[in-house]
Design a protein with these regions (language model features):
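Positively charged n-region of N-terminal signal peptides that target proteins for export
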Residues: 1-4, 108-110
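Subset of outer-membrane beta-barrel
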Residues: 21-300
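Sec-dependent N-terminal signal peptides
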Residues: 4-16
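Short, basic/polar N-terminal leader/transit segment immediately after the initiator methionine
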Residues: 2-5, 22-24
């Protein structure tokens, strides 16, 4: 029984990830596609610097908390680069990571581009043993656990853009590396591959209003699949609001402001899954500052 309880505790980060994914992601990903696709590095006419924060399942002790800082820019008309650092904490476990990305784009026709991107990743997993309480204080399983573990990985993506639309595919955690913090076979975990498909279309109603529906599909090799539908409306390129539906998981209203050089957004995940009994929802903030020139294509 003792081992079973410990296994559950140690695996909280990973087992909740089968629902919320091992790779934490934002509900407002549509504002910066580089957050989920390395091939989007350099896809806009600006250099967006994106700062994000998300608190998942508010009111639930030890619930996940996620921070990230990223930036990407084009080098020329065919090449782009990007970088991202993030921290993800769940209970007594934490995951710190960094990505370096390179993208190469091929122009197709007058307004279309097809880009391929690759990012090298480095993750550091940590356990705070002082927060672990056991029925038997002499249990050596925790004593011999690894405090920190560094795991390399990689991500690959493709990204096709047109005048008012985009489609992308990402394969994350390509290597599927093992993560064995407790140095025991029965608690060993693995970084499973994640597959993302995302697409959207921006429709200009008139000079003041535009609507952008989008779709994000996520598939994890462990067997979990998730679909997310979003509709975002913008008024005079100043204020925006939207709503997402994550299948069998959450409804997500969101809103914010978007000026020439910056964007601010807030999203609230209203939990629909069994976690709603314990959770008071999830809060998310995102801030984007755009360096360099600004063009209408930057929104894509």
């Amino acid at each position: 029984m003792k081992r079973y309880i410990l296994a559950v505790l140690v695996s909280v980060f990973f087992l909740t990830s089968l629902q919320a994914q091992q790779i934490a992601s934002y509900s407002q990903y549509m504002h910066d596609h580089y957050l989920i696709n390395p091939a989007a590095a350099g896809a806009t006419e600006t250099m967006p610097i994106t700062l994000g924060y998300k608190k998942v399942w508010t009111g639930f002790q030890g619930s996940p908390e996620f921070y990230s800082l990223s930036g990407n820019t084009k080098i020329n008309e065919t090449m782009g680069v990007g970088a991202k650092v993030f921290s993800y904490k769940t209970g007594y476990e934490s995951k710190f990571g960094m990505d370096l990305s390179y993208a190469y784009a091929i122009k197709i026709g007058e307004a279309n581009k097809l880009a391929f991107g690759l990012s090298a990743s480095l993750y550091q997993f940590s356990i705070d043993k002082s927060q672990i309480s056991l029925e038997d204080p002499n249990d050596n399983t925790v004593m011999y656990a690894t405090d920190k573990l560094i795991v390399p990985d990689a991500n690959f993506g493709t990204y096709f853009t047109g005048k008012n639309y985009y489609v992308g595919i990402t394969v994350a955690q390509l290597f599927g590396r093992k993560v064995n913090m407790m140095n025991t076979d029965y608690l060993e975990q693995r970084q499973v591959r994640h597959y993302y498909f995302h697409g959207g279309y921006k429709y200009e109603i008139n000079e003041d209003y535009s609507v952008e529906p989008s779709l994000l599909l996520k598939f994890i090799e462990a067997g979990e699949m998730q679909a997310e539908l979003n509709v975002k409306g913008t008024f005079k390129n100043i204020a925006w609001a939207g709503i997402s539906y994550r299948l069998n998981d959450a409804v997500i209203p969101m809103f914010g402001i978007e000026m020439e050089k910056f964007l601010f957004g807030y999203a609230y995940d209203i939990t629909l899954s069994d976690m709603k009994t314990y959770s008071q929802g999830s809060h998310e903030l995102i801030f984007i500052y755009k360096l360099g020139s600004v063009s209408s294509a930057a929104s894509l």
